[in-house]
Each structure stands twice: as C-alpha cells, then as structure tokens.
Design a protein with these regions (language model features):
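The feature captures the conserved acid-bearing segment of alpha/beta-hydrolase catalytic domains
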Residues: 2-81
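Alpha/beta-hydrolase-fold serine-hydrolase catalytic core, especially in secreted/extracellular enzymes
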Residues: 46-201
C-alpha cells in the first residue's frame, strides 16, 4: 500500500525483523520531511541488518528528481516483494510496541491489563527452548502449536539465560478458537500457551 499522508515520524523499524520491507520515496517529496525520514530509515534498517544478518530484509529507494508520485517508478516494489514469503513462525522475534499497542505479535502475546506502549520484547527460539533476551513488561505469553514445537515434550523458557519455566503444556480447544477469531489466519492458530512472569531486576 502507498503510505502518502502525514505522520508524526516517531515510528522505528525494530519490529520489522521478520518482514520483507521496501520503502520508496521521491527525493523531492519534502512534505512532512518525508524524504529526510526515508533516508534516515534506510540507515536505520541497514544498521539493524548489520547487527542481525538473518533479519531486516529491506530495500529503500530514493527516486532522484521525483516528487510525491514518483512517476510510478515505485512499481519496482512489486516484483521485489514477490520474491519474499511471509514466515508466521520465526525463530526470533523483536517486538517494539508503539503508542498504539497490540495484544499479539507472531507467537507472543500480552493480556490487555499488561499491555504498554514504548516497550520492547526480544525472544529467541531454539527447538523446545525459548530465551527471553529482553522484556519490558511484567508478564509475557508465549503461544505454541505443533508446527512451532513438539508439544508432547517439555518446553523450556529462560530469561537472559536463567530458566524460569520447564514443563509440558496442555492443548486447549478454547485457545484454538480464540486465535482463529483474532486473525482468521490458519498459520497463526495456537493450541497452547505459557504465561511467564519476568523476574524483577
């Protein structure tokens, strides 16, 4: 979709780790500082990918001499996007909440009473083990299904390398129903979940 309206320009790209993202801007499109912010995002995305080469697939193109509509030069975005396939169950999640918050992101979720803006959660999965590297919330929910893990075997959750949960989980038909209703996406249906409390510092 072409995003061409004004924006407070306070968003950051950390949550795009598992999303192929392309940004096209006319070099002369200066309203709302769009051209300057696009150039900043090119640097931000490149920096994130340098630190995390398995993530942040991106293409930023500043179309020289072009204004708001770019004379349709941004059509190159379509074949670029067509090369990439969405992965609904990534190994690593970086979830940075903006001021408009959400209650789920891939296989992570939060209860509404624990949802806060401007927070970051980073979780790495390795087989049956989930390591929470960072979580600015008091509690985080890890959702599971049989494509993500072997739910017949124990699951381990650690926080910054220290185990905070180990055990088997129980499949729930109610959670299956809930996650179907949330998105209507069969690749994001979960049958079990673990709610963990983040140790206080």
């Amino acid at each position: 979709a072409a995003m061409m309206a004004g924006h407070p320009n306070d968003s950051t790209p950390e949550s795009l780790r598992n999303t192929a993202f392309t940004l096209h801007m006319g070099a002369n499109d200066s309203a709302y500082n769009r051209n300057k912010v696009a150039a900043q995002w090119e640097k931000l995305l490149a920096g994130l990918q340098e630190k995390d080469p398995q993530g942040y697939t991106h293409l930023v193109k500043i179309h020289e001499g072009k204004g708001h509509w770019m004379d349709r030069e941004d059509r190159v975005a379509v074949p670029w996007m067509a090369k990439h396939t969405r992965n609904p169950l990534p190994q690593r999640i970086v979830w940075k909440q903006d001021d408009v918050t959400h209650n789920r992101f891939y296989w992570l979720a939060v209860n509404n009473d624990n949802r806060r803006g401007r927070t970051t959660t980073i979780v790495q999965r390795d087989g049956q083990t989930f390591n929470i590297e960072r979580c600015d919330l008091q509690k985080i929910i890890i959702r599971l299904n049989d494509d993500l893990c072997n739910l017949n075997k124990p699951i381990t959750v650690s926080y910054q390398g220290n185990n905070i949960f180990r055990g088997k989980v129980t499949r729930s038909s109610e959670l299956i129903r809930q996650t179907i209703l949330e998105r209507g996406d069969y690749t994001s249906v979960f049958s079990a979940e673990i709610t963990v409390t983040i140790p206080s510092k």
